[in-house]
C-alpha cells in the first residue's frame, strides 16, 4: 500500500514537471522550423503530433516507474521463493518464463497495432481540421453527407484497431489467464510430489502469488509501453527537423533596400522541372518593381525564395551586403512588409490583427496603415471601429476588406522592403487605384506581383517571367512597344 501510494504521488509530481518543460520546449522548437516543414505537414496532423508529446511523457513516466517497481518487487519475491521452496522453484520459473514470453509477444503485437492507430489518428485529426476550415464550401455544395461518409471511413479504420483487436492479441489474453490457473495446479502437484511441508507451501504460494501479481502489473503497463514507440515515431519529424534560425547567424537591424538575385535555380522535387531557371536580377534601393507572367511561370515561387521560405538548388539572394542563406531570417523578415496570397486573419479584434507585425504601434499608426490600404473609411463606419471583432478566417469581412487589412498589416511596421503577391486581386477598381497610388508615394523598395496591369503601370521596372526565367523587362511603355509577351498579356485584359 505504501509503495503504491508513493508510486502514484511520484508519478503525478514528476509528470507535471515533465509536461510543463517538454510542451514548452516542443512548441518553441516548432515555431523555429522553416516554412518548408509546415508546407509538408497538414496543420491538423501537426496539432495531433504536438498533443502526442504530453501523452508520450506521461506514458514514459508511468511505464518506467511501474515496470521498475514491479521488477524490484519480483526480485524480493524471488528470494522468498528460493528460501521456502527450492524444489518448487524450477516449475515456478518455467511458469514465469512463459509469462515473460507472453509479455514480449503482447508488446510486439500491441506496438504494431498502436503504430497504425497513431498514424490513423493523426490523419483523422488532419481531415477534421480541413473539414471545419472549409465548412462553408461543404455547405455551399451540399456535400455534408459525402463529407460525413469520408470522415466515417477514416474513423472506422481508427476505431477498428481499438475496439476490435487482432486475433493474436485476444489469444495472448486468454493464454495469460489459463497460464495462471495451470501454474497454480502445477505448483500444487509439485508440492505433493516433493512432500513439501504445508507451512512452506503456504509461504511459497504467497510469494509466488505476489510475484505473479507483479508480473500482471507489468502486463497492465504493456499497452502503455507499446504506445511509446509509435508516439515517439509520430513526433520524430519535429525532433529531427533542422530549425531555421542559426544561433550565430548575424542579425539584420536595418536594410537599405537593395536586392541581388544571382544565378538562382529551384525545383520543388529532385526529379521535377526547374521552376526558377538560372534567374539573375538586380533591384536598387527604393526601386518599384512589378513582376508579371502567365500562371505557373514561377512568380510566387520567386517570392517564397526571396523570403527564405524555400532553399534554392543553386545561386544566391543578397539583401544589401547580407546573404540570405547566412543571416537570421526572422530579423530580416521583420524589416520586410509582406502580403501573400495565402495570408489570413487571426481570431481577435481588428487592431491586433493589424499590429501583430508591430506590437509597439499605436491606434494612430493603425489608422494611418488603414488609410494607406484605403480601408480607413470602412472601419470608421463600423460600430466598434478598431475594436471590431474578427472571427476565424475573417468571416464577416468581404474579400476586398480582408486583403486591405493584410495590406495595412504589411505597411504598419514601416518596412524597408515591401513584397506584395496578388495583394489587390480582390479589390474593386477604385480601391485598387487608391492603393496603387499610395504605393507609388512610398520611398522603400517595392516588389509587386500582379495580374492586373493597372497595379504595376507606374512601376519603375516591370519583370516578365516565363518558365522560370526573365523573358522581358522594362517600363510599361517600353514593354508595350516591344509587342512581346507582356503586350500579349496586356491585350488580353483590354
Predicted feature residues:
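Juxtamembrane loop-to-helix connectors within ABC transporter transmembrane domains
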Residues: 31-76, 133, 161
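Cytosolic ends of transmembrane helices, especially the final helix of ABC transmembrane type-1 domains
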Residues: 120, 124, 139-143, 167-170, ...
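A hydrophobic transmembrane-helix motif
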Residues: 1-2, 64-107, 163-210
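ABC-family ATPase nucleotide-binding domain "signature/switch" substructure
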Residues: 301, 334-342, 353, 360, ...
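Conserved ABC transporter NBD signature motif
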Residues: 315-322, 332
Amino acid at each position: 500500500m505504501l509503495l503504491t501510494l508513493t508510486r502514484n504521488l511520484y508519478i503525478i509530481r514528476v509528470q507535471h514537471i515533465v509536461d510543463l518543460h517538454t510542451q514548452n520546449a516542443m512548441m518553441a522548437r516548432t515555431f523555429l522550423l522553416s516554412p518548408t516543414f509546415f508546407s509538408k505537414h497538414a496543420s491538423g496532423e501537426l496539432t495531433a503530433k504536438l498533443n502526442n508529446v504530453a501523452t508520450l511523457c506521461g506514458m514514459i513516466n508511468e511505464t518506467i516507474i511501474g515496470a521498475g517497481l514491479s521488477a524490484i518487487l519480483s526480485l524480493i519475491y524471488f528470494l522468498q521463493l528460493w528460501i521456502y521452496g527450492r524444489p518448487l522453484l524450477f516449475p515456478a520459473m518455467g511458469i514465469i518464463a512463459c509469462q515473460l514470453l507472453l509479455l514480449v509477444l503482447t508488446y510486439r503485437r500491441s506496438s504494431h497495432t498502436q503504430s497504425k492507430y497513431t498514424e490513423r489518428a493523426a490523419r483523422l485529426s488532419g481531415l477534421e481540421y480541413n473539414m471545419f476550415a472549409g465548412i462553408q464550401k461543404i455547405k455551399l455544395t451540399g456535400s455534408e453527407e459525402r463529407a460525413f461518409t469520408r470522415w466515417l471511413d477514416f474513423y472506422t479504420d481508427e476505431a477498428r484497431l481499438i475496439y476490435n483487436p487482432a486475433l493474436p492479441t485476444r489469444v495472448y489474453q486468454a493464454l495469460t489467464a489459463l497460464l495462471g490457473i495451470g501454474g497454480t495446479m502445477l505448483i500444487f502437484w509439485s508440492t505433493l510430489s516433493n512432500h513439501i511441508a504445508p507451512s512452506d507451501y503456504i509461504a511459497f504460494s504467497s510469494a509466488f502469488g505476489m510475484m505473479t501479481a507483479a508480473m500482471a502489473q507489468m502486463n497492465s503497463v504493456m499497452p502503455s509501453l507499446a504506445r511509446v514507440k509509435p508516439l515517439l515515431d509520430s513526433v520524430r519529424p519535429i525532433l529531427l527537423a533542422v530549425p531555421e534560425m542559426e544561433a550565430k547567424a548575424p542579425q539584420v537591424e536595418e536594410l537599405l533596400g537593395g536586392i541581388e538575385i544571382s544565378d538562382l535555380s529551384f525545383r520543388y522535387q529532385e526529379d521535377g522541372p526547374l521552376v526558377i531557371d538560372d534567374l539573375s536580377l538586380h533591384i536598387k534601393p527604393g526601386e518599384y518593381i512589378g513582376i508579371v507572367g502567365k500562371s505557373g511561370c514561377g512568380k510566387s515561387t520567386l517570392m517564397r525564395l526571396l523570403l527564405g521560405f524555400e532553399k534554392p538548388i543553386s545561386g544566391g539572394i543578397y539583401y544589401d551586403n547580407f546573404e540570405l542563406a547566412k543571416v537570421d531570417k526572422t530579423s530580416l523578415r521583420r524589416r520586410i512588409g509582406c502580403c501573400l496570397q495565402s495570408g489570413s486573419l487571426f481570431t481577435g479584434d481588428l487592431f491586433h490583427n493589424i499590429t501583430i507585425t508591430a506590437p509597439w504601434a499605436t491606434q494612430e499608426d493603425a489608422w494611418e496603415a488603414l488609410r494607406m490600404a484605403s480601408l480607413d473609411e470602412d472601419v470608421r463606419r463600423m460600430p466598434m471601429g478598431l475594436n471590431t471583432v474578427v472571427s476565424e478566417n475573417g468571416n464577416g469581412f468581404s474579400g476586398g476588406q480582408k486583403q486591405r487589412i493584410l495590406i495595412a498589416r504589411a505597411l504598419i511596421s514601416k518596412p524597408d522592403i515591401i513584397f506584395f503577391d496578388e495583394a489587390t486581386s480582390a479589390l474593386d477598381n477604385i480601391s485598387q487605384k487608391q492603393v496603387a497610388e499610395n504605393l507609388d508615394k512610398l520611398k522603400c523598395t517595392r516588389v509587386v506581383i500582379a495580374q492586373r496591369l493597372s497595379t504595376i503601370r507606374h512601376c519603375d521596372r516591370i519583370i516578365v517571367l516565363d518558365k522560370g526565367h526573365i523573358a522581358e523587362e522594362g517600363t510599361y511603355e517600353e514593354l508595350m512597344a516591344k509587342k512581346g509577351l507582356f503586350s500579349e498579356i496586356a491585350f488580353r485584359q483590354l
